Amino acid sequence: MEVNGHHKPRREYNGRECNGVQSVNNFGDIDPWTAWAYKPRTVSLLLMGTCFLIWASGALDPERSFSVDRVSSVKRGVFAMIAVFLAYSFLQAPSTVLIRPHPAIWRLVHGMAVVYLVALTFLLFQTRDDARQFMKYLHPDLGVELPERSYGTDCRIYVPDHPKSRFNNVYEILFDEFVIAHILGWWGKAIMIRNQPLLWVLSIGFELMELTFRHMLPNFNECWWDSIVLDILICNWFGIWAGMKTVRYFDGRTYEWVGLSRQPNIISKVKRTLGQFTPAQWDKDEWYPLLGPWRFIQVLSLCIVFMIVELNTFFLKFCLWIPPRNPLIVYRLVLWWLIAIPTIREYNTYLQDRKPVKKVGSFCWLSLAICILELLLCIKFGHGLFPKSMPSWLFIAWTTVASLLMMFLLVWTWKIYRTMIRKRL
């Protein structure tokens, strides 16, 4: 964080360097009012955590723990195990490129991602029925088969004989929970990716994914006006527009991040405090997909991973019997959003890095690992649930697209290679 303000000379503290990024610059750059939050107090917090564990576990009072039933003891033990790991991540996990609102927050997100990765690994070794029943431990309403709603049973816009309303089909879809989810989701993606052409590729690409897998999931069976007009041209467009407006608004302003103690009045102090929860930099990410064949493949890989994560939401919901309004769906989406924020920044930094030998950041690695495990869960638990095969015309269409893409990349690579040979001669 860059802070402008006068301060007394202090002993310089060099923060840990992780993936080539300095986690904390030095204490001299931190405002005096908030400098305490950047000083390491790992031993003190360890002693406080130990005292809490002694109280919660009844280590000094074994008779009290005997009165608790076995199921409750196991639940408490699992939650305590997760809490200890998250506390360790909060204090000692590797820092990322993000420094707002505090590097420790993103270390905590790193720990939550590892916990989610381990939980997915555990589920992968269960049967489908056992996994469905295990979900009851996470939410009591789960473990029950659910009816899957289809949005394309009646695609008429005007229904003259409907008892409620002649436009009832439109009203039902307009007031569906997925409308708000579309807008908020694309607003969040626009803030993360900050590149409008790439966002539109993802928007249209996901609608093509819905068309591709509509024979497997009734939820993807939508009317043409729902998919094209409502989803792409209204909800997705509004979310992308609002997100890019947010980025341009903050990107076009000049900031002097004066410390909290130097703000002139209460209103300024409140604004500065709220500003701590916004990104330090709002500059738009440049991906340059047409820089070369390899860069094109790298950006295309990002789009593919994005769409796989989106598809995993619906397939996991279908396979594990999780209703759309269950809070677990929201928790997973919020966790993925928190993971994706540093992942996008790390991946963009990785693409822009000119070093001959480089590696992706820890969040990039975790995101890819979680995506793969979710996909494996969908494949394993979805076995036998989708009796309908893909229509032949759809298979031919995607095969043609893949073949044309391969030919395009080969011709592009050959032209670049031929140009390099001519320059050497």
From Swiss-Prot:
UniProt family annotation: Belongs to the CDP-alcohol phosphatidyltransferase class-I family.
Membrane topology: Multi-pass membrane protein
Principal cellular location given in the protein's record: endoplasmic reticulum
Keyword Endoplasmic reticulum: yes
GO molecular function: CDP-diacylglycerol-serine O-phosphatidyltransferase activity; L-serine-phosphatidylethanolamine phosphatidyltransferase activity
Zinc recorded as keyword: no
Record protein name field: CDP-diacylglycerol--serine O-phosphatidyltransferase 1
Cellular location(s): Endoplasmic reticulum membrane
Domain of life where this protein originates: Eukaryota
Transmembrane portions of the chain: 42-62, 79-99, 105-125, 197-217, 224-244, 296-316, 321-341, 366-386, 393-413
Any Pfam family matching the protein: PSS
An individual GO BP term: phosphatidylethanolamine biosynthetic process
Organism this protein belongs to: Oryza sativa subsp. japonica
GO cellular component: endoplasmic reticulum membrane
